[in-house]
Amino acid sequence: MTSSSTILQRLTQTIEARKSADPAHSYIAKLLSSNEDKVLKKIAEEAAETIMACKDNDREQIIYETADLWFHCLIMLARHDISPEAILSELERREGVSGIEEKLSRSQNQPEPTKAE
């Protein structure tokens, strides 16, 4: 089995390399050069397929569809010049923090909405 960080690095490098590839010859280049809505719709589609696989309790499909979802999320991140390491750092920051506490801290750090005058 390949190290998860190694495959993530290779996928990231491939996606970065495809930024300059011909969209006619590369699916990744096609998504990267298209309207962002195309990528976002693909993520929504893959998320829905992952949900359906979960509802069907189909382990193989859950794995397959989650891989598709993650892959398309990596493409979305690349469009915004966000590295997977930024996401991993955020997950690491949250590690060991209660989800309830983390959510509460976010709401406490939000400015109060102003009333429309």
UniProtKB/Swiss-Prot annotation:
Pathway: Amino-acid biosynthesis; L-histidine biosynthesis; L-histidine from 5-phospho-alpha-D-ribose 1-diphosphate: step 2/9
GO biological process: L-histidine biosynthetic process
Family according to the record: Belongs to the PRA-PH family.
EC number per UniProt: 3.6.1.31
Cellular component annotations (GO), alphabetically ordered: cytoplasm
Organism of this sequence: Nitrosomonas eutropha (strain DSM 101675 / C91 / Nm57)
Regions of compositional bias (Basic and acidic residues) in chain numbering: 96-105
Positions of the UniProt region annotated as Disordered: 96-117
Pfam families, per the entry: PRA-PH
GO molecular function: ATP binding; phosphoribosyl-ATP diphosphatase activity
Catalytic activity: 1-(5-phospho-beta-D-ribosyl)-ATP + H2O = 1-(5-phospho-beta-D-ribosyl)-5'-AMP + diphosphate + H(+)
Comp. bias intervals (Polar residues): 106-117
Localization (cell): Cytoplasm
UniProt name for this protein: Phosphoribosyl-ATP pyrophosphatase
Keywords: Amino-acid biosynthesis, ATP-binding, Cytoplasm, Histidine biosynthesis, Hydrolase, Nucleotide-binding
Primary residence: cytoplasm
SUPFAM superfamilies: all-alpha NTP pyrophosphatases (SSF101386)
